Amino acid sequence: MALVRSLLVAKKILSRSAAAVSAPPKGFLAVYVGESQKKRYLVPLSYLNQPSFQALLSKSEEEFGFDHPMGGLTIPCPEDTFINVTSRLH
């Protein structure tokens, strides 16, 4: 009985962590950034109107079209470039 209870608790924890990864908060968009190792970032939807962020999106469109290997929006640039661009948008 204790084993079943432990398994149920573990399942709840895993489902919560999986849901947290897959669903960004309202008003945000999840993007995956990096060249070889991808890291997930949450960016405000307001960034979509910014020309510098749109340039990153164009780069993504050129490389991937609408077929993103991570299942989400992937931006193929170095992580430090992404941080540099987005830090100017605050």
UniProtKB/Swiss-Prot annotation:
Subcellular location as annotated:
Cell membrane
Q: What does this protein do?
A: Functions as a positive effector of cell expansion through modulation of auxin transport.
Instruction: Name the GO cellular-component terms.
Output: plasma membrane
Give the signal peptide as a residue range, or say none if absent.
Answer: none
Determine the domain of life of the protein's source: Eukaryota
Family to which the UniProt record says this protein belongs: Belongs to the ARG7 family.
The main location class comes to: membrane
* Protein name per its UniProtKB record: Auxin-responsive protein SAUR23
What do we know about what induces or represses this protein's expression? By auxin.
Q: Tell me if Cell membrane is a UniProt keyword of this record.
A: yes
* UniProt keywords, alphabetically: Auxin signaling pathway, Cell membrane, Developmental protein, Growth regulation, Membrane
Q: How does it sit in the membrane?
A: Peripheral membrane protein
The GO annotation for biological process reads: auxin-activated signaling pathway; response to auxin
Is Cell membrane among the key words of this record?
Answer: yes
Q: Name one Pfam family in it.
A: Auxin_inducible
